[in-house]
Amino acid sequence: MKENNEQKNCLNDQYIIKYIDYIKFEKRLSENTIKSYLNDIEKLYSYSKNYYKFISKDINKYLESLDYLDSRSLAHLITVLRSLYAFLNKEGIISHNPCNDVVMPKLKAKLPNYLTIEEVNKLLDINLVKPNDYRNKAMLELCFATGLRVSELVNLKVSDINFNDCYLRVIGKGKKERIVPIDDIALKYVKMYNDYYRNKLLKNKDSEYLFISSYASKITRQAFFKLIKSECAKKGIEKEISPHTLRHSFASVLLKNGANIRVIQELLGHEDLKTTQIYTHLINEKLKKDYEEYHPRSRKE
């Protein structure tokens, strides 16, 4: 992150430096979130170094100049600006948040891509030969069994797993801790990897992290994403894959099998139920399909 930050002109500004320290140390936002915030703040700073003197009409004029942004990017930018100006207001640097009256663009719900059970089973069918294979199998099984974010998965420590009581201690967004149960199958492969193959990847080095790369260090998010894409390509799964594909698949399977959405919210570590409710489209699809199949008046002549 440091390398990227040095390229940002906005980090020469004392108020922005204070704000970044605030979201990093007090709000405890993740490194990736801070990077995305900085990208938007850099846009504002490039537009005007007197951003802290802006009133509502200045903000609206600035937003009008960004007509090349799609609605999702614009909504993210407005969220960042509201947060920045709220901080400046709280610190007494400005007397009013000029973003208070800004209207958010309407967003079409972006439905998460997920794998069917058949596709998941294909993905998890890994030929176990090398230590890397056992690690990959353990990671994929665990990810589908728990719905962990990729960042949570790669940051797991051996001490976070309770093999006796079958649960994980997960440190999620904002350093919030949650307990997530693990099923017997995933636990079996994680234990097998940890007991017999992890040390082979460590090559006599020490690490507190559970999943180890071929370079005897903690595996990265990028490496795991590459693994998912590679395995999907091998298995002929042609869907658009993201780092969260297995997380979405986990939530989708639970919902389709009747799990309470509040339980899914807790397992996924979502602070806001609205974030979890995007998965309810799956229930609506199933209801519609069942209605069309079984209701006599839904059948077309």
Where in this protein do the model-derived segments appear?
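Conserved catalytic core of the tyrosine transesterase superfamily
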Residues: 1-301
